[in-house]
A protein has these predicted regions:
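Hydrophobic alpha-helical segments within soluble ligand-binding/sensing domains
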Residues: 122-125
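Nucleotide and nucleotide-moiety/phosphate-recognizing core
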Residues: 2-117, 127, 131, 135-141, ...
Length: 202
């Protein structure tokens, strides 16, 4: 394994962040879709997200020819920016080299959407990132988890678990998200968006 800590300043280093909540009760909930994708990516790369630093669990990896850090902030969703900012500062990573994966209620399960910048769209984890990073100009991969049913509280919806059908759709979308992340790490943002920003029918 290459050394990250001998030379923290590396213009090619990427920070891939999955957003979610820590705790067994949140595993496989809609709000933890970001954790799910990053953990699946780590598994594919033969890495474990087990190292601790700056309020986060992380793994060091290589994606293609690029160095990358896979990060799961352990601050709970609403304070995710604290951990991300600390990693950016320590490793001298710019916002454009941070790729954030998170849940989006405006997309149906099975869909994903890649954006290079944008508002928080009501997502508290992204609000925290924007506040601590000082910019909204960072790439993100949004994972569809579906709109909340009528008369259901939003928190209950996003903290709820996927049913079997939607979990299957998430698995497929997660595989596509991983391929998209690989393209993005390689600088092929347009290719990733053209290939994966396709709406799937229910």
């Amino acid at each position: 394994m290459f050394s990250f800590f001998k030379n923290r300043k590396d213009s090619n280093m990427k920070l891939i962040v999955g957003l979610g909540n820590l705790g067994r009760e949140y595993v496989n909930t809609r709000h933890n879709a970001g954790f799910y994708v990053v953990e699946k990516l780590a598994y594919e790369l033969g890495e474990d997200i087990t190292e601790r630093k700056y309020k986060g669990l992380f793994a060091k990896a290589r994606i293609g020819n690029e160095k990358a850090i896979l990060l799961e902030p352990q601050t709970y969703m609403n304070n995710s920016g604290e951990s991300v900012r600390a990693f950016m500062d320590y490793f001298k990573i710019e916002a454009k080299d941070v790729i954030v994966v998170y849940d989006d209620i405006n997309l149906e399960p099975g869909n994903l959407r890649i954006r290079l910048k944008g508002s928080a769209g009501g997502h508290n984890g992204i609000k925290s990132l924007i506040a601590h990073m000082g910019t909204s100009d960072f790439p993100r991969v949004k994972m569809g988890v579906g709109e909340k049913p009528a008369r259901m509280d939003l928190a209950d919806h996003v903290l709820g678990h996927f049913n079997a059908e939607d979990k299957k759709k998430l698995d497929e979308a997660a595989s596509h998200a991983i391929e998209a992340i690989k393209l993005m790490v390689d600088g092929q943002y347009d290719t990733a968006m053209n290939k994966y920003n396709v709406k799937k029918t229910k």
